[in-house]
């Protein structure tokens, strides 16, 4: 959209033009899916175990107290309190859904993966709005200014599930993650064209584009559901179904 206003033929300022433009500068829409058998017992639960192992090393938990630390996190009213634990949330969720344990050597252990499935959906984009004003001085000096405003919206949801086993024990778990980025941005573009010689078509110009300054906020949360059965040597078994939600994180 352009609106042109003629000021006069004999005035220094001949024209003032106003413009507006909109376009979607970035499209985030995407779908992804995968799945299959897991070779070599590969499982995300071992990633959870490694995360918590690194955390315990950093905070100085003695190896002999690994089991006690797991019990404390498992029974905590708020294990996501960064002032108390500051532990990786995926590892905490693994503890509280019976996906992590401790072996006879006080080492954190996970499960052996049998098969998995993963789906991801991304939506959103960056919407750009340009507001323009341009001046024509004596048909020889042209000045333009554009203010760019950006609206950012990005959403991603993912689902991951694994069938797992460890010795005679077996089960599965499902992990849902939600992530959102919202915000806005702004930039400026300034340009000029000069015709230095009145009787010549020769022109020279230059332009300045500022970086785009963004103010963004991230929101993320997760949900982990597990259904595992422990088969004991005396012939009895115990089925545990657990669901764990994280609080909404804002950054």
Q: Would you name each region that the model predicts?
A:
Residues 4-251:
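Outer-membrane beta-barrel porins/channels
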């Amino acid at each position: 959209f352009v609106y042109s206003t003629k000021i006069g033929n004999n005035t220094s300022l001949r024209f003032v033009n106003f413009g507006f433009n909109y376009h979607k500068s970035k499209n985030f829409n995407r779908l992804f899916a995968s799945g299959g058998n897991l070779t070599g017992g590969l499982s995300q639960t071992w990633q959870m175990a490694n995360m918590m192992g690194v955390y315990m090393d950093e905070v100085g938990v003695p190896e002999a107290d690994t089991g006690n630390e797991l019990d404390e996190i498992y029974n905590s009213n708020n294990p996501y309190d960064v002032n108390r634990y500051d532990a990786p949330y995926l590892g905490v969720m693994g503890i509280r859904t019976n996906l992590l344990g401790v072996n006879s050597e006080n080492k954190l252990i996970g499960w052996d993966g049998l098969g998995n499935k993963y789906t991801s959906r991304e939506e959103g984009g960056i919407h750009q709005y340009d507001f323009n004003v341009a001046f024509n001085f004596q048909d020889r000096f042209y000045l333009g200014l554009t203010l760019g405003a950006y609206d950012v919206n990005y959403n991603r949801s993912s689902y991951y599930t694994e069938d797992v086993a460890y010795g005679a024990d077996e089960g599965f778990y499902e992990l849902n993650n939600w992530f959102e980025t919202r915000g806005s941005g702004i930039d400026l573009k300034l340009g000029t064209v000069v015709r230095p010689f009145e009787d010549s078509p020769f022109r020279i110009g230059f332009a300045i584009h500022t970086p785009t300054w963004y103010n963004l906020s991230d929101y993320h949360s997760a949900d982990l559901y597990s259904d595992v059965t422990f088969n004991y040597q005396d012939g009895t078994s115990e089925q545990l179904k657990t669901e764990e939600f994280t609080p909404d994180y804002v950054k």
